[in-house]
């Protein structure tokens, strides 16, 4: 049994519920034609995001990828602002200019998602260099998928971070597929984290990325190592996305049996059972959290739908840094 504090465990449950319910609601809005642009969902990957994020300090920084909804929520984005952003509204966290694939929240330390595969890696290295030069004590976490590790920028970013001993964690959420390509057909190493050896930095493997406690405890060790001035770490967490690569992907390259097998490893249900069986929380407590999250998600939709679209003159706003 874990020795983690009850409040932390309940926060894990709440955050994962927020990710699941927000993404399923956004998927409904996509089908209604209310969401401009492409969307990529984090359903099934909740533990891999939440366990990592709760191991950080609130003022630590992250860079995200195209599948950034879960990371944004886990980092503490305002749900109203997020939903408004995804619907392209002026009240969104990026004033409707970012949308789903470029969701960002600088107030929460989220430097932004990125529509380019691996695009956040160089940004993370720059942010980590900034923290090192200013001696802030903050660290940076770069989120990316398994497919991004075959991009040239992966080598460039990890190599530079290792040379300069930067306070950055490279975090690969391995869901097994780069769009429709099985990762086993795309790389010759058994596990992504083994690539750390080429750069002389530690590699960490979280085998069950659907166990939020395992993710948290593993990630916390890496956070303490990096914050201690020891340089970067490469972490791999194995999980699975329940939905297609994007809102336009029917997922025909996977069998129903494979998807159902992973659904039996539901990270939220796993934590719910753990909390109840170990008498950490009652079913009623968890149901109350679920009800409040559902209410907050519905409120975010109402806020977003009632918000205005950006005025034409806003196209000339935020071009330069103040």
Language model features by range: what are they?
Residues 109-306:
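Glycine-rich ThDP/TPP pyrophosphate-binding loop and its adjacent helix/strand module
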Residues 66, 237-239, 319:
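A general secondary-structure junction signal
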Residues 72-74, 180, 245, 314:
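Short acidic, gly/pro-rich beta-turn/loop elements at beta-sheet edges
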Residues 24-28, 34-164, 182-188, 193, ...:
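Cofactor-binding active-site loop characterized by glycine-rich and histidine/acidic residues
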Residues 1-48, 54, 243, 247, ...:
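Conserved acidic/glycine
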